Amino acid sequence: MNGIPFEHGLIVAAILFSLGLCGLLIRRNLLFILMSIEVLMNASAVAFVVAGSRHGQVDGQIMYILVISLAAAEASIGLALLMRMYRRHHTLNVDSVKEMHG
């Protein structure tokens, strides 16, 4: 049974990465920035799996598990910081928080 072609998998990973990067650069809401970082991490994880399947090794799947666990830790810490920032400043806009500090 053949999977998807190598080039198609990398194209999907590149599209996901570019969407995450656009969200990271365009959005000013901290929640959307955190979601964009998650999309970036998932794109790199997909690239690891595709590269591992190309060479017939399970290293890509092992790296996928590592990236997913890292993303879970990053999400929990990021959401805790997000809740703290919202309680303190009553906004999630990154620009307005920068202006408050002077």
Curated annotation (Swiss-Prot):
Q: Which UniProt keywords apply?
A: Cell inner membrane, Cell membrane, Membrane, NAD, Quinone, Translocase, Transmembrane, Transmembrane helix, Transport, Ubiquinone
Pfam families according to UniProt: Oxidored_q2
Q: Which GO terms describe its biological process?
A: ATP synthesis coupled electron transport
Q: Does the keyword Membrane apply?
A: yes
Which top-level enzyme class is recorded in the Swiss-Prot or TrEMBL entry? translocase
Catalyzes what?
a quinone + NADH + 5 H(+)(in) = a quinol + NAD(+) + 4 H(+)(out)
Classification via NCBIfam families: PRK05715.1-1, PRK05715.1-2
- What's the protein called, per UniProt? NADH-quinone oxidoreductase subunit K
Q: Supply the source organism for this entry.
A: Tolumonas auensis (strain DSM 9187 / NBRC 110442 / TA 4)
**Encoding gene, per UniProt annotation:** nuoK
